[in-house]
């Protein structure tokens, strides 16, 4: 259902003159009416012509096209965001296909690497370990009292780029931009946070422009105590907030999620969001092929927290489709840099232990090696689905893809690593190596592939199809927790919007132009499941839909009325 157009109430504003123009959430620039210019002491501070937001957006689009590099376009858009947020979101929504890769992956990776160099204006909250005893004061300095979504990172595992220190702040800023652009969550309700616990990136420590705490990262008890102080301070200031953990290192991501997911409404997008969008994609791809996900054999390259999170959600989905847990686990094979995970492998991480294959069941495999490589696994398993979350480029070789295709007429290949430079194989190569038969979904955006005069659209398995809808659903329903069932409902809803399933052709995932519609549908499904799970107050379907409508922010100016502080 599309959001209803409703008359916005006037806002009563105590600020005036140049001060008002400095508020990105309130600034309208040349769109202030003549009456507003008189009432707010703006006469003479703006050019004479009063413009509409569409006229402003057209000028901004022309200016944007004048920039030649993606990083310069990113800097330009961030400048608009820090000047006039309403215009920023109107512009982005007008050109989402073009601009999403610029405000988020892959360009945000370069923006994180160059954060201190391209820094213009502060956005969000920087909490350094040096200021840990001022945590409550720091959060009290945030002027917005009604924060509903926080995205927090410690900058240690930024995309596939590793430790970027406080440069990781680019990720929460970008993620929250998508919460608004795709999920309709008002920017006034969002807060990006970076926990500055030092950096082990020597290049940053030696950089005279680096703006973070110049110290090796704190670890162990010091680290977890610091994060806990942050969580407790957040609960004190905004007890009902949704907290998203973002780009934490593998060694910390799962422990933090497990520790806090039942203490505060929280989730980890790298683990749970990636899993949800991947499972939604696989459900749709399986249906398009006339089957179910439970019928497929799946091989992963990459057995970190993200890969294992996806695998566990796939297992949950195939159990929902009728498999026993044992049968579901026997269909999933995890390969990391040491080979296939088996019960004889030492030094497994806690979240890997349930995803091993029993070595005794592999005695008839065609291999002489003790270390079972990806090629060994593909040759013996004969998988239907190959998923890459390794963060290493080129590991899906021609030999591996052709071996897979030899036994699977319509292979599903998903090189999900970000950014583009880390992808396991390009869609162009995968399509060519499978004679045009592979169904490909990637983690980063790729242009359609042309092979033998046929055009193959490439779906981006983008978490933006999932997390904005989850956020909107949590806010609209008032959910106190995010359960696994809520995530599964998001995956199922995403699959229902697949053009390939609905029309028998096109991409396996919806087009970006439909992302707000998809987010609203996911919000409803998530909110309804929250009610069924007992983590939100039960209401009628009509009341939940109305709450979604009421919370869906649109990039439109509102009339201002003057008031005193």
From Swiss-Prot:
It is an enzyme of class 1 (oxidoreductase). It catalyses: (S)-malate + NAD(+) = pyruvate + CO2 + NADH; oxaloacetate + H(+) = pyruvate + CO2. Its cofactor is Mg(2+); Mn(2+). Non-competitively inhibited by high concentrations of NAD(+) and L-malate. Also inhibited by CoA, acetyl-phosphate, palmitoyl-CoA, and oxaloacetate. Activated by aspartate. Divalent metal cations. Prefers magnesium or manganese. Optimum pH is 7.2 to 7.5 for L-malate. The active site is at 104 (proton donor), 175 (proton acceptor). Keywords: Metal-binding, NAD, Oxidoreductase. NAD(+) binds at residues 157, 270, 418. A divalent metal cation binds at residues 246-247, 270. The keyword Glycosyltransferase does not apply. GO terms for cellular component: cytosol. It comes from the Bacteria. The record marks 270 as: Important for activity. Gene3D superfamilies: Malic enzyme, N-terminal domain (3.40.50.10380), NAD(P)-binding Rossmann-like Domain (3.40.50.720). One of its GO terms (molecular function) is NAD binding. Belongs to the malic enzymes family. Homotetramer. HAMAP family: NAD_malic_enz. NCBIfam families: PRK13529.1. This is NAD-dependent malic enzyme. The lineage of its organism: Bacteria, Pseudomonadati, Pseudomonadota, Gammaproteobacteria, Enterobacterales.
